[in-house]
A protein has these predicted regions:
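Hydrophobic transmembrane alpha-helices and their immediate loop junctions
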Residues: 1-149
Length: 149
């Protein structure tokens, strides 16, 4: 099997998990805080199909891409400032925590085989990368929403 194809193949679960969890946490947080729009759009789910756009997913395999953004409305939050911050910050925090969990698992299980080690490496990498990417102060990243509040 071609090495670069294998790298792409083993990276796909990392992309799927990181992006799906990120958008799911945003949708769930917004819904819990009173905004039912993400729920009405079917985005309060861990089904990756609901969180990806086909072109954005393909771009992620090669350079940088995007998931399907969860649309939220602060109009329905009880405390708009605090709740907007929570909706912006929590997905990134969860990605960072997941990345650290997968990094620990990688350190523990990498000697069990190349494939499991590589898979855990990419699960850690994409979660941490998405967290770092979202703290960049560039629209439409999460950091810009935090700075706007």
């Amino acid at each position: 099997m071609n090495g670069s194809f294998l790298v792409i193949l083993l990276g796909i679960p990392g992309i799927l998990v990181a992006t799906t969890v990120h958008e799911f946490v945003r949708a769930l947080t917004s819904t819990v805080l009173g905004d039912n729009y993400p729920k009405s759009q079917g985005q309060v789910t861990l089904n990756p199909v609901k969180h990806f756009e086909p072109i954005g997913f393909l771009m992620m395999l090669y350079s940088g891409g995007w998931g399907k953004p969860v649309e939220t409305s602060a109009l329905y939050y009880k405390n708009r400032k605090r709740d907007t911050l929570l909706v912006a910050i929590l997905p990134t925090v969860v990605n960072l925590i997941l990345g650290l969990v997968f990094l620990f698992a990688y350190g523990t299980f990498r000697s069990k085989g190349y494939y499991i080690g590589t898979l855990l490496h990419y699960l850690a990498y994409y979660n941490v990368a998405l967290a770092v990417y979202n703290v960049l102060p560039v629209a439409p990243m999460d950091c810009t929403k935090v700075l706007a509040v």
